[in-house]
Amino acid sequence: MLKAFRHIYFVSIFLALSAGLHAQDLPSLGRRSGITSGTFPNGISYYLVSNTYSKGYANFALIQKCADNQEDVRASLDYDFFASKGVGYTPDGYISYAGGSAIFNFEDVPTYRSVALDSTIILLFNLVGRHKGEQAIVASGDLDVARLKDRLYIMSLTVPKRTPTPEAPEYEWKPSSAPRFIHYGNGCNSLAEISVTYSSSRIPRKYMGTPQPLVTNMFAHQLGYILRKRLEELFDSNKVPLAYVRFKYRDSASTDSDETFTLMAGVADSDVREATRLIAGVLSDIDRNGVSAEEFQDAKARFQTAMDRSADAPVTNREYVSSCVANYIYGAGIVSHKEAISFFSGRKIALEQDRSMFNRFIAALIDPARNLAVSYGTPSDSLDTDALKREFQAAWKNTPVRTAYHVKSNDTLALYYPVEKKMKIKSEGIDPQTDGTVWTFANGMKVVFKKTDDKQVRYAMMIRGGYTEVPDISEGESAFVGDMLGLYDICGMSPMRFRNMLEANGITMNCEVTIADMCIRGTAPADKANLLCRSLLSIHKNRSLNKEAFAYYKSCEALRQEDFRHSTDGINAVTDSIMCPDFYYPVTKTVEKLGDDLPEKAEKYFAAQFLKCQDGIIFIEGDLNPSSLQKILVRSMGAFRTGKAFSVRPKVEYRLRSGWSTYTVDKTDRLIGAGSGANLALAAERPFTMQNWCAFRIAVEYLRRELIKDMAPLGQYFEIYPQLQLLPVERIAIFVNCSPCPSAGLPADVEPADPLEVVSRMRDALPRITASSLSAETLKGLREALAKEMAGEASDPDYVMEAFLLRHSEGKDILSNYSTYLSKVTAEDVMNVISSLDRGSKVEYIIK
């Protein structure tokens, strides 16, 4: 009964939170600030958001209830109208369907062009007039909300009152008692994925605006974190290679069907049986025994850290629109991350009581049979799922002991504590690029601190000298050097235990080694600054090679690379490597080129780097007290080794292939990419100046708008990824990735085209765009939009840190005085960029 009534049980959670409340008295969370909503007299609802995430652009949506006749809906659209305004398809086309409603989505409408905004509003009401039922208009972006609301109201007067929508059939939860084991071919070479999905009753609409979805979401994410950590440790201890562990919770705000909780593991095809046994064992253990207090405390801390990070993250227009759509269709609450944090911080529940409720949540959800589906995606066309089902059930039944949990609160005591003499600050100044405070210490080390309101501190420790300085490095090993620093025992802790200790304290840490430098970077809670310094010092002074960790890393990396090659980034990495053949230091990983002696070679490099910490800089950005941070740094800086050695910028041979190359692969060949698609890469050597950089960014947007006209009749969604490279040569590149939209989301006279036709159209489009003229009006609009975007970047902590590191690493400034350089960009500058790309290296990569 507990499993069948899991959400009724969640009402009891809130009874514990608010003594004396009845189920019908669950408090409403209200709506996030910044959203203007209501209903016009004729019954049309509206949700309007002024959001500066994407300067100069806005997303619009129209929701029509009970408008699920796809033929009628598709017939109402004309792609020419939107394409001429620079508005392309979303991944679903212009139309998607959810909860018995049709949803029209128009993204990146250029609001800096009044004609585009006016035309979009007119079109929305043309669509409104074609459907008599209840409807809602959603808009999020660079908008004057008060003015937009007035315009929508005036337009609404031209439309008759809406007919009330009939009540939708009541949702019925249909639990299952027998597990389902499913197999499908995944088109890979050796990578298999095991997915374990538990279904659960959706939250009733009357509770969607209460804290109940927040608590379900919190427990789901805590469960996902615990399962990931347990599986990673168990696979590691059993030396079973693991590409990834992922967890996905599909909540009631994103579907009109059951909620689902899915655990996914990427493993070798040859290890499917053993992986099944291990996964079943972990699930059985957590079902029988729940989680320990220490493990639950760790999961709570990780969830809180994730919430803190998301509170500082900007909200995209797509995210705003999605949450408003879910509110209109499903009654979902629209709560900001900060409001959610406020709710969770107000939950005055003792740890043991909270853990007890969490364990009851686990017991209600996880079961060896009920509401369970296990899916296997493998390279083979057939699989004995009956045998795997028996393996799963046997492992569940025979799990002998609890899974070990290796995060201990006293692990931090093992970290290095600085005993060296305090290092005085020799001078203090202001960094001209970031306006941060520069502290120069007596040993030559420099720290730049920029005070912000972010509770999550961003940090980076950069030391000049990149992978060209690794002794005897072999061709292709450069891409792996940064990973080697994560394979050391630190202060007696294994690599995994050290990572767990950092994660338990909310600290992220990654090492990146480029052609120019080494950089250790990440985030940390503001109250963990001292622990962060001790962790960096521990890597610096007390590390030892762990050869077993490297061997396991190499076996896992082979699987991770196959997973990566099926992604958009993987496709672009392949096309990039085609344009730059025989480059000795590629950034793309090829595990066949990873030598077993790289850890020893990398250690010589790291040892040399850590002897010259003065040849670099530390950047810290966040809500820290400057005086308190100074005390930590004065105590810590003397423990870092410094010397007189300095690195010089390397000279490396680099050849960009000229001309046009075409590669065609069958999607069943299990090579690169997933599904059908057309991909195009363009690159050209071009000297970097700030004016050229601004011209390149305008050119990318102009190309996007022009390509929309060519891709719209072919039913293609596409994205453009611009790339700036400064070393070993100054180069610009763009990567265009096209994928077919579903027919149901396209206008009636459009069907998704074959990838070969898509590439042919792009091939013809380039000369046309290159020969076109950029009008003064268009340039002005594009320049104004970019000015707004760059103004937003100048206040974005992540972008500021990237710009700072780029200046200190490669000597180029992409932040200072941007408006001056942008104002100087001419139409000729923009067209020269496009022309150089058209004359440069071009690669077509077709998956059919």
Tell me what each language-model feature is.
Residues 9-18:
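Bacterial N-terminal signal peptides
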Residues 22-50, 136, 142-209, 213, ...:
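Proteolytic maturation boundary segments
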Residues 594-598, 602:
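Alpha-helical scaffold elements lining the catalytic groove of polysaccharide deacetylases
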